[in-house]
């Protein structure tokens, strides 16, 4: 073959001729003669004739060439690129070559150089074809040509490059092929004259115009767009999807603003996912922190074909929006429901928290801010609100964020710098729900925000009450009044959350005003942020997982909703003595051997609940429940209610505890409603998610019945048509067949006699070598009618199902109350399982502020240790000893001892048994801790600054009914300053605040303070140990027992030895320590000698304080 032009004569310029010669010399060893070119021409013509005899290969998946005509039939547009089978003249096998439309009359120089034909002018002087040398040279040229074509990727690839503005690129063809039959596109662009090309590439398809229109309204959203049987991403969304979902992104334009940098690109970048995997991928995108929108087609192909807009693209609309907090379309949610008992992460709360604040007063360390919060859990329907003042440390805000653990934040207005830094720190830390960055949305706050918010909330609830016809109902009016009386900052947050959730279609949750809860209710013990972390309430401090936390220790629940309720109990211990006694008495009854039968019955019942009923019910309330899920929920509720159908009153439950009796009696009250709904459902169809047979025949709506009759009528006509078809073919009878999913086909043998009888109007659908399959025009028309009825039936079934969900939603509160009763029973059974362990005792409650525990143990360490835990006593009373100064060697167990005391107090006020021989406790209103050393670089605060700031916060909030734990206060500065601060704080705690206090220190000088309290309000205790050996052979044995008195040494060198510091270093440290101790001993001895000498000179100095100081100095020697 020879490279020349077949469409136009070669240019006459000498430069172009040189270029042609240069390229020809690249492909051939020497220039061919005219005779050889003639041989090439004949071979080329032969090849072309062979190729023309080959059938065209059909393109698959390219639906851009299909459009709907006015009758709804599919017609074919002009092809963009057609693949043909060409036969290689050398080896005889076909190869795929992409052929474009006929090129324009004028071609570029580069294009002309790469076309394969001959010019009539070259016919003269042709060499004979049988010349062996010519034939050899021809084979070599063709071999080089094949290598060249293989390198470029196609025989006419340079033609495509030369006509980039008028010809679809191969990647574009692949992209369209990846789509489905509903991927509407514009006709292939025609050849454009000079200046006719549009900036930004080829003309946008109708689908792309639709995508841009929707995207411009939702620029902050990753859009997943339904296109036929796939969901597709476009532009920047495709890049994000490819990154997060590990799918292929077809290159193209990323931006939606026709940016000049992308003018050379013809199409948007795209990626696709199958329809049935939509929610799997949406969950992954939402979990990664993205806001995801699902755009669906609002019409089907069959209904569109008979509609007024059959020639327009499919109508599409944004139907769903999802973020972390609003994803309720899957009952599993985003947390994967890893049980905490297995040592996984703490269960996700799924709260969305709205926060706003105003500057109340002060500046710097005296700054006070007024904060309002509203936290909503769309998965369960819970709503928490609070209004409070907070200091410059923002400890109150931090405590609420750690308690609620939101997965999404909505910030109204501007936050102060301190609050903003705290939010940023916690939202990016592992302390949040999902262990990754929390999504943050911001809402502007107007100057008239309070008035506008109050009006918005009032109108919202007034409209809801009017729609429910309960405006004159006294309970409904009281609930409305309760909402309207919320504090101003809470109302601002509530209004913002209503508006925010309206965008996601979840505003109905605020109609459930029964589930509004105040966070700071004084009916619960206050556990601030430091306490939650230091005492490891929800997460351990090692790897931040649930294993090793108090919640992990107490969690023996069998249901998801029971686990969530127990988490609330753990974080909010009770202050009401009567409620506590009721709860702990219920636990005692459940562990009693006399109630074994009833308890086993309860355990079996709860063990049969496999679904998360609380989340299922809220999904029904939102109208997002699936048919199999609805059947499971109703059958589970029926099973639960029937288990206790004979229980009419709490006394019939078999338990004497009021909590247990009332919870069990509430369960069967829903049985009548559940059975009523189940009687409407066809169980088998619901289990198989068959929407068409979901309702029993007597419960079907008029629309469903009408379209079912229409389908039956069409199918009857199809059967009647068999006789007509048999008469045309002159057969006794005709039998329909189904092939590849296509129904009502008539098979005719491929014989001349049989085919002759087939009318020309019959459409051949498929066939084999022996037979052909046809559709008659009547069958095509009837099938089209049947498809229309089927799609209308599907819409009617969906509408009826939505109406059923709305009817069930009217019973939401009664169903939810029954599920809450089950959750309470589950939590009590969990606490009973803990109480049944050896060494646990029922706590005794008193109105006094005291902690009297005999042989108490650390609840978590005891379960994690292989060896037995050493128990210890504690005796604190506000009227006697209310503070302990704890000293002892490093690693002696001081911190574990004080944590143990706090944890026992918290467990007791949860209503749990405690690990001790006996326990008598008063009602503590809070537990405050100041433990550990860390700085706050975000706020520019040093370790010592953080330490003192937290201490100041405790001094402001602590009451005589609080338990305060201070660990090594004052160690972040010099010894003299540290001792002074520690002594002043301890004295203030004991004398002024009068809290129960546990003070850990290595400052032995503080032990002298106990002598200034004659009634033993402060007492010295230490962690016991034994010494053996001396010098470098000295060894310390920790006994982990609490003894009276003071430990005068901390034995830090022993810890250094256990840490495997180098022996030479330890020897130097021991020598320096001995020298320092000797120097201090001599100073004290000199001071003691001086005091004794002064006393002998002037006996009048010997008052009581003098002799106490003298005795203390002598003891320290």
UniProtKB/Swiss-Prot annotation:
Domain of life: Eukaryota
InterPro entries: DNA_mismatch_repair_MutS-lik_N, DNA_mismatch_repair_MutS/MSH, DNA_mismatch_repair_MutS_C, DNA_mismatch_repair_MutS_core, DNA_mismatch_repair_MutS_N, DNA_mismatch_repair_MutS_sf, DNA_mmatch_repair_MutS_con_dom, MutS
Gene transcribed to yield this protein: msh3
Ranges of compositional bias, category Acidic residues: 61-73, 175-185
Organism field: Neosartorya fischeri (strain ATCC 1020 / DSM 3700 / CBS 544.65 / FGSC A1164 / JCM 1740 / NRRL 181 / WB 181)
Xref: NCBIfam families: PRK05399.1
Quaternary state and interactors: Heterodimer consisting of msh2-msh3 (MutS beta). Forms a ternary complex with MutL alpha (mlh1-pms1).
Record key words, sorted: ATP-binding, DNA damage, DNA repair, DNA-binding, Nucleotide-binding, Nucleus
An example molecular function term from Gene Ontology annotations: mismatched DNA binding
Protein purpose: Component of the post-replicative DNA mismatch repair system (MMR). Heterodimerizes with msh2 to form MutS beta, which binds to DNA mismatches thereby initiating DNA repair. Msh3 provides substrate-binding and substrate specificity to the complex. When bound, the MutS beta heterodimer bends the DNA helix and shields approximately 20 base pairs. Acts mainly to repair insertion-deletion loops (IDLs) from 2 to 13 nucleotides in size, but can also repair base-base and single insertion-deletion mismatches that occur during replication.
GO cellular component, one term: nucleus
Region of interest: Disordered: 1-135, 165-203
Protein name, as recorded: DNA mismatch repair protein msh3
Biased composition (Low complexity): 1-14
């Amino acid at each position: 073959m020879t490279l020349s032009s077949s469409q136009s004569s070669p240019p006459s310029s000498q430069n172009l001729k040189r270029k042609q010669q240069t390229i020809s010399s690249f492909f051939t060893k020497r220039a061919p003669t005219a005779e050889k070119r003639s041989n090439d021409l004949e071979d080329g013509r032969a090849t072309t004739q062979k190729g023309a005899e080959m059938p065209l290969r059909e393109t698959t998946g390219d639906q851009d060439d299909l459009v709907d005509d006015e009758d709804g039939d599919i017609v074919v547009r002009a092809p963009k690129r057609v693949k043909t089978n060409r036969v290689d003249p050398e080896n005889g096998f076909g190869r795929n070559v992409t052929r474009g439309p006929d090129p324009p009359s004028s071609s570029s120089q580069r294009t002309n150089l790469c076309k394969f034909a001959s010019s009539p002018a070259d016919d003269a002087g042709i060499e004979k074809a049988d010349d062996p040398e010519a034939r050899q040279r021809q084979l070599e040229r063709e071999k080089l040509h094949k290598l060249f074509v293989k390198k470029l990727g196609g025989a006419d690839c340079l033609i495509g490059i030369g006509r980039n503005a008028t010809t679809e690129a191969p990647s574009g063809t692949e992209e369209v092929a990846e789509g489905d039959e509903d991927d509407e596109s514009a006709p292939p662009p025609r050849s454009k004259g000079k200046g006719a090309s549009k900036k930004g590439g080829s003309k946008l398809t109708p689908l792309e115009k639709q995508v841009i229109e929707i995207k411009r309204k939702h620029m902050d959203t990753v859009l997943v767009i339904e296109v036929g049987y796939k969901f597709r991403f476009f532009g920047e969304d495709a890049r994000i999807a490819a990154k997060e979902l590990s799918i292929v992104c077809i290159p193209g334009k990323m931006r939606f603003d026709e940016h000049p940098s992308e003018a050379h690109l013809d199409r948007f970048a795209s990626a696709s996912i199958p329809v049935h995997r939509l929610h799997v991928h949406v969950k992954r995108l939402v979990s990664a922190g993205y806001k995801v929108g699902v755009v669906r087609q609002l019409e089907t192909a069959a209904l569109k074909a008979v509609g007024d807009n059959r020639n327009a693209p499919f109508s599409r609309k944004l139907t769903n929006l999802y973020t972390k907090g609003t994803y309720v379309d899957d009952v599993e949610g985003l947390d994967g429901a890893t049980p905490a008992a297995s040592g996984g992460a703490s269960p996700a709360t799924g709260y969305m928290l709205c926060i706003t604040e105003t500057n109340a007063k002060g500046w710097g360390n005296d700054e006070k801010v007024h904060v309002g919060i509203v936290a909503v859990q769309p998965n369960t329907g819970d709503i928490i609100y609070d209004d409070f003042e907070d200091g410059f440390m923002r400890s109150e805000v931090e405590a609420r964020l750690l308690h609620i653990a939101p997965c999404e934040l909505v910030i109204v207005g501007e936050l102060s710098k301190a609050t903003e830094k705290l939010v940023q720190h916690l939202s990016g830390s592992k302390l949040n729900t999902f262990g990754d960055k929390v999504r943050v949305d911001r809402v502007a706050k107007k100057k008239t925000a309070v008035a506008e918010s109050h009006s918005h909330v009032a109108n919202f609830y007034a409209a809801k009450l009017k729609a429910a016809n309960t405006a004159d109902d006294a309970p409904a009016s009281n609930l409305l009044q309760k909402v309207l009386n919320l504090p101003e900052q809470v109302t601002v947050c509530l209004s913002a959350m209503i508006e925010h959730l309206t965008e996601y279609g979840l505003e109905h949750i605020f109609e459930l005003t029964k589930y509004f809860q105040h966070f700071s209710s004084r009916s619960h013990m206050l556990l601030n942020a430091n306490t939650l972390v230091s005492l490891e309430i929800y997460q351990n401090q090692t790897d931040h997982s649930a294993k090793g936390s108090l919640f992990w220790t107490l969690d023996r629940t069998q249901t998801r909703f029971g686990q969530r309720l127990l988490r609330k109990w753990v974080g909010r211990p009770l202050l009401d003595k009567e409620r506590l006694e009721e709860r702990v008495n219920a636990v005692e009854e459940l562990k009693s051997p006399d109630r074994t039968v009833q308890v086993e019955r309860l355990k079996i019942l709860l063990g049969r609940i496999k679904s998360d009923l609380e989340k299922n019910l809220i999904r029904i309330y939102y109208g997002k429940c699936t048919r199999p899920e609805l059947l499971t929920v109703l059958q589970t509720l029926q099973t639960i209610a029937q288990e206790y159908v004979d229980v009419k009153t709490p006394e019939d439950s078999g338990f004497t505890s009021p909590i247990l009796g009332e919870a069990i009696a509430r369960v069967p009250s829903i049985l009548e409603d559940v059975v009523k709904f189940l009687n409407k459902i066809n169980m088998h169809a619901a289990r198989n998610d068959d929407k068409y047979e979901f309702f029993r025949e007597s419960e079907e709506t008029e629309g469903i019945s009408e379209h079912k009759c229409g389908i039956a009528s069409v199918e009857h006509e199809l059967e009647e048509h068999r006789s007509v078809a048999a008469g045309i073919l002159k057969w006794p009878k005709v039998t329909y067949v189904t092939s590849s999913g296509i129904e009502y086909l008539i098979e005719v043998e491929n014989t001349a006699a049989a085919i002759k009888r087939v009318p020309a109007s019959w459409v051949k659908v498929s066939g084999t070598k022996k037979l052909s399959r046809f559709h008659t025009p009547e069958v095509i028309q009837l099938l089209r009618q049947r498809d229309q009825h089927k799609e209308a039936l599907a819409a009617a079934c969906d509408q009826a199902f939505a109406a059923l969900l709305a009817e069930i939603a009217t019973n939401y509160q009664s169903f939810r109350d029954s599920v809450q009763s089950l959750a309470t029973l589950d939590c009590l059974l969990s606490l009973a399982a803990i109480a049944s362990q050896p060494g646990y005792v029922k706590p005794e409650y008193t109105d006094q502020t005291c902690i009297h525990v005999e042989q108490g143990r650390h609840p978590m360490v005891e379960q994690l240790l292989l060896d037995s835990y050493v128990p210890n006593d504690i005796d604190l009373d506000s009227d006697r000893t209310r503070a302990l100064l704890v000293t002892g060697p490093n690693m002696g167990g001081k911190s574990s001892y004080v944590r143990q005391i706090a944890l026992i107090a918290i467990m007791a006020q949860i209503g749990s048994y405690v690990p001790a021989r006996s326990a008598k406790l008063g009602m503590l209103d809070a537990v405050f801790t100041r433990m550990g050393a860390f700085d706050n670089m975000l706020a520019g605060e040093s370790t010592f600054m953080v330490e003192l700031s937290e201490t100041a916060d405790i001094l402001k909030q602590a009451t005589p009914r609080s338990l305060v734990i201070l660990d090594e206060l004052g160690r972040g500065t010099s010894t003299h300053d540290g001792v002074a601060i520690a002594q002043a704080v301890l004295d203030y705690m004991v004398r002024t605040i009068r809290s129960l206090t546990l003070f850990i220190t290595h400052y032995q000088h503080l032990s002298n303070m106990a002598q200034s309290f004659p009634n033993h309000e402060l007492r010295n205790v230490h962690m016991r140990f034994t010494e053996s050996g001396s010098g470098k052979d000295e060894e310390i044995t920790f006994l982990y027992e609490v003894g009276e008195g003071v430990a005068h040494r901390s034995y830090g060198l022993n810890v250094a030895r256990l840490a495997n510091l180098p022996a030479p270093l330890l020897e130097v440290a021991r020598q320096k320590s001995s020298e320092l101790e000797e120097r201090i001993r001599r100073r004290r001895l000199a001071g003691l000698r001086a005091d004794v000498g002064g006393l002998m000179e002037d006996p009048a100095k010997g008052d009581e304080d003098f002799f106490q100081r003298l005795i203390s100095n002598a003891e320290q020697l």
